[in-house]
């Protein structure tokens, strides 16, 4: 079963901030490669919504580690949709940042 993917507002803002920072610090190729990797990891969730491990405050909340990149994707897998909640750098204190609000 293929799920739809919905990027929540905070996740879209995270993705944009990551791209902007990497573009300024390392250039377009690095920013683009990182964004491509994030998109490819999220595409895995379309086919396998339970690919990540349980995390966060609710039973449905999960996280997917992005290999070779210092990011995790925080998401909720529902029946027909995967909602991407956040894209966070692994150095951040992430436990308190899993909330949707």
Descriptions of predicted regions:
Residues 1-61:
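Basic, Lys/Arg-enriched alpha-helical interface segments
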Residues 58, 68-69:
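Structural motif corresponding to alpha-helix initiation and N-cap regions
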